[in-house]
Amino acid sequence: MHQYQDLLEHILSDGAEKHDRTGTGTLSVFGHQMRFDLAAGFPMLTTKKLPFKAIVHELLWFLAGDTNVRYLQNNGVSIWDEWADANGDLGPVYGKQWRSWQAPDGRSIDQITNLVQMIRTNPDSRRLIVTAWNPADVEQMALPPCHCLFQFYVANGRLSCQLYQRSADVFLGVPFNIASYALLMMMIAQVTDLAPGHFVHTFGDAHLYSNHLDQARLQLTRAPRALPTLRINPAVRDIFGFRYEDFKLENYDPHPHIKAEVAV
């Protein structure tokens, strides 16, 4: 995945020093874009080991419309714990917006259901969009959405996805985001009888925290390895019917994990 290594190099060489909400400090670039063709393999970073289980369970949690960390904790995933309140609640974050966006007239809009239906019935639509950025709810969210809007595109029997990420923790968060949205694209492609196409990742503020710089430099000393293959149970035809056991990552041979502290 040279695309990710190139982004690390770009930030380290050209990034601007910026202050941030956490008080940690960052090197930051704006408006970067990466593109991954899923025909070349599943874009799971190989220059450090990623926890596939956490990526899958987080996406299933989003798709369930859940906003409490209990499901994640019950499955050994702790990535949202720092932001949860005493009851495990996060406020109206991703799952709420994806599955039950509240309209001013009181309607609840299920963006994922609408998206899948539109891909099936009107694949040339330019409105194949899901947004998690709800200005009316942002102040009630434990963490406003970083990966905040995505759009699908159908051409020549292939389904592609572009993600806009307003804020990107490039060392810790972005590898998760790449794999998560590539997985979502493959799932939706399966239930709409399409082949996976390209995942396009567009960034607003893409940054390395000041306490991740040494880790990024270490990662750049590692050569990317062949991408793994993701197998999905072909019997699942409902986007909300997937379970963790329906996914199998094959031939994943990453370099060792690199530890870094999350900025909260």
From Swiss-Prot:
Record's GO cellular component terms: cytosol
Cellular compartment(s): Cytoplasm
UniProt: dUMP binding residues: R21, R126, R127, R166, S167, A168, D169, N177, H207, L208, Y209
Keywords: Cytoplasm, Methyltransferase, Nucleotide biosynthesis, Transferase
Enzyme class: transferase
Catalytic reactions of this protein: dUMP + (6R)-5,10-methylene-5,6,7,8-tetrahydrofolate = 7,8-dihydrofolate + dTMP
UniProt EC number: 2.1.1.45
Primary localisation category: cytoplasm
GO BP: any one term: dTMP biosynthetic process
PROSITE patterns: THYMIDYLATE_SYNTHASE
Binding residues for (6R)-5,10-methylene-5,6,7,8-tetrahydrofolate: D169, A263
Domain of life: Bacteria
SUPFAM superfamilies, per database record: Thymidylate synthase/dCMP hydroxymethylase
Pathway: Pyrimidine metabolism; dTTP biosynthesis
Active-site residue numbers: C146
Family matches, as Pfam families: Thymidylat_synt (PF00303)
GO MF annotation list: thymidylate synthase activity
Function: Catalyzes the reductive methylation of 2'-deoxyuridine-5'-monophosphate (dUMP) to 2'-deoxythymidine-5'-monophosphate (dTMP) while utilizing 5,10-methylenetetrahydrofolate (mTHF) as the methyl donor and reductant in the reaction, yielding dihydrofolate (DHF) as a by-product. This enzymatic reaction provides an intracellular de novo source of dTMP, an essential precursor for DNA biosynthesis.
HAMAP family: Thymidy_synth_bact (MF_00008)
PANTHER family: THYMIDYLATE SYNTHASE, THYMIDYLATE SYNTHASE 1
Family: Belongs to the thymidylate synthase family. Bacterial-type ThyA subfamily.
Subunit structure: Homodimer.
Stated name of the protein: Thymidylate synthase
Organism name: Afipia carboxidovorans (strain ATCC 49405 / DSM 1227 / KCTC 32145 / OM5)
Gene name tied to this protein: thyA
